[in-house]
Amino acid sequence: MSGKSRVHIDPNCRVSYGAFYIRGLYDVFGKQRVGFSTRFFSGLKHEAPKPDYEHYMALVVAGPGSSRKRVVIDFHDSTKINEAAYDWCDVYAKTNYNKDSHPPGLYPKVVVTAPNSGYRIWGLNETRFHLYTNLLRCKLEPLSGRHRFRKDYMYQHDRRPIETYESCAQQQERSLDASPYVFFISTLWPHQNCIDVTNPYRKRFMDICRSLPIEFEGGFFGDDPTHPQYEAFRDLIIHRKYGLDGYIAKMTRSAFAFNTPAVHGCHGWKLSEYLAMGKAILSTPIMNELPAPLEHGRHVHFAQTDEGMREGVAMLLHDPAYRAHLQEGARDYYRHHASPEAAIRVILESDPFLK
């Protein structure tokens, strides 16, 4: 019913997080049928006035007559369900859902959708237009606060369109020279799960790459000497800042990408970017659900132990046929399950009214 419907988005939406899904709505419904409105959201109760909209985007799909469906897209890093938003909606799309974190059958409205990243969807004039009109719709008091609200819109514009990432799939080298190149950068996160799991995984990967006769570039951004891992990771701390265009160019050149769950075990923005770029991906095990499983040896190469990681690095460096196979698998997964359009279609297909 997408051709007959209009989509109304709550203007309190954090567009820096929601832009990926807004782009998907444009792709499915048509841009002229997607807009912002406060008309349908008076019944949406907020558990915490300001943090709420770091977590989700509320929207209403309005069909012919008075028919409508209320949808929440929860893109928070944690697996927690926002109870107030869940009670309000008909469909609760969750980016980071872990079925082991909730009793079976407790949340029947949940549908798992694709991981997102930060992408530009509007030019500067359109960004300013939506910023000021939505600020007025929020009566100058958006839930995230005016300063953050404005920063979100400009951050969205400072990103790159998803087509920039998609075009990298055609630019990648299918073969490597005698001294291959691997690029990986990360923040040295202070969250406990990152201290326990994410940061050590990333350090082991970097150490493996640095031990090989290849050109490795990257490290951890970490300017806080009080971080509990700062001393242990000191030789991997970098202070150079990479511009977004430089980052994309280096990731395109890199023989493959490395992925591991991030803050609170979330998918992280890197996964969305790598799939859009059609990268061959070496990944530690995925913690949360996906709209369809990433298959080892088809879409991604999984490794967990040091030995497995070392073997995976060697395969991706020295087996061009396998690397090309994973690149094609990543592109195929992206097209069917992880593009903005695919992320919205899996939501629509979960409810007969929305199909």
What are these regions (language model features)?
Residues S2-G268, I286-A292:
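Nucleotide-sugar donor-binding catalytic core of glycosyltransferases
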Residues F233-I238, L244-L354:
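Catalytic binding pocket for nucleotide-activated donors in carbohydrate/polymer assembly enzymes
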Residues G30, G118, G145, R210, ...:
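Generic surface-pattern signal
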